[in-house]
Amino acid sequence: MTALDLSSTVGVVGTGTMGQGIAQVALVAGHPVRLYDTVPGRAGEAAAAIGARLDRLVEKDRMTAAARDAARARLVPAGELAEFADCTLVVEAVLERLEAKQELFRALEDIVGEDCLLATNTSSLSVTAIGGALRSASRLVGLHFFNPAPLLPLVEVVSGFATDVTSATRAYETARSWGKTPVACADTPGFIVNRIARPFYAEAFAVHEAQAADPATIDAVLRECGGFRMGAFELTDLIGQDVNESVTHSVWQAFFQDVRFAPSLAQRRLVESGRLGRKSGHGWYDYTDDAEPVEPHTAEPADRPAYVVAEGGLGPAADVLAMIREAGIQVREEDEDHGTRLVLPSGGQLVLADGQTSVEFRDVVYFDLALDYRRATRIALSAGHDTLPQTLSEAIGLFQALGKQVSVIGDVPGMIVARTVARVIDLAHDAVAKGVATEEDIDTAMRLGVNYPLGPFEWSRRLGRDFAYDLLDDLHLRDPSGRYAPSLALYRHAYATEKREGAS
């Protein structure tokens, strides 16, 4: 099944930010577009707003004046739904209320032709549930655009339980013909992005709730060490704490309160206090005019160690050994492999985050996972109460000698980046095993939908088969709530190459 012909009329119901954005996308692609809103006059106002945005595209040389004029001529505000009778595709972008969407599509069934494709832009409701009220849900598909729709390339094409392959394929190809990057997924809570992205927020909030680090430090580590474009606290302030918490709560409830998706009490308190982020002037951060910028915790300069002893290859942090040598610090290598660790002159150990805690060992400092140790500008370290001050000082001095800012956080297993990435990888493997989407589509969705530096499977391949599983298994031993229990899919992935002779 091919994409809709450009002569096909596209109807958009709902004229808020998303409705206008979707209408603009279809319009610029070349379709005639009809806009409808239940509030009289709103469709005309939305058409004028879209026209103004087209003017700005002309001013920026992204559109010719002739193309703008032609697009304006194709955009028609509708006074009633009956004017959608000749539409070949209708996309709804109304309030996220199941009853409202069901009522709308029931009305559309009596208006449009049998070959008209119906699409919902829902981000949190079940496509299957929406279609449950229709006489024939086979032509209903989810088309989840990301805001702002004209700018962001990703579209999740969601098949409900009754959606037929022809409808899903037609929606997919149409989105692609509009210049978007579609990904196909099953109707699951959160679809791809809002399902797999939950740990990015949840683990940052958990580290904060454990009093291990403040929001500014956690955000800085996620950006400068993890390679994420924004930290979890600043991003949720931008999204709106109420909006982000609502999505988290919706996914958690849809998964029957699965602890892996549990909301954050700290975020709940923030919402209850009215601190919703940028839009209210205060969230995790203060956005009032006279507010002072909050700086991350950064360690004072410390002396570099004269040497380190390498025991093992440091696994995903192998580049650190080369960087130490390049910094002029002697590396002594031991033949016996005791794991991925460095021994400092104090006798203390420097170990890559592995889901254990410093307090379990005599004299250990953990360092966090980095997307790219060479490009990272900040590294997080954690130490227990029994860690010698000299050991911590040497660890700080070592990474400072490599050109890194150092943030010392509390002794939490898995630290910040490592536990976040491990959980994202786990949810991604679980989603594939349950038929939600392919590995390729999940990687694409996470890179384009939430700007991750790598897709979960790309990250998994870089870290090695067992990194995420082993870290989460260690975390699960220390927090047996089930939050960190590795999925069966991740277990299979981690040990796919290890075979036993038989059952005992």
What function would you assign to each model-found segment?
Residues 19-20:
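N-terminal Rossmann-fold NAD(P) dinucleotide-binding loop
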Residues 42-45, 56-118, 125, 329-358:
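Rossmann-like NAD(P)-binding element
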Residues 15-16:
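Glycine-rich Rossmann-fold phosphate-binding loop(s) that bind the pyrophosphate
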Residues 35-38:
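Conserved acidic E/D residue at the C-terminus of a beta-strand in Rossmann-like folds
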Residues 63-76, 138-139, 180, 362, ...:
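A short helix-to-beta-strand connector/capping loop
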Residues 2-4, 29-31, 180-183, 187, ...:
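NAD(P)-dependent Rossmann-like dehydrogenase/reductase catalytic/cofactor-binding core
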Residues 26:
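Aromatic pocket-lining residues of Rossmann-like dinucleotide-binding sites
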Residues 103-154, 159-173, 341-392:
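Rossmann-fold NAD(P)-binding glycine/threonine-rich loop
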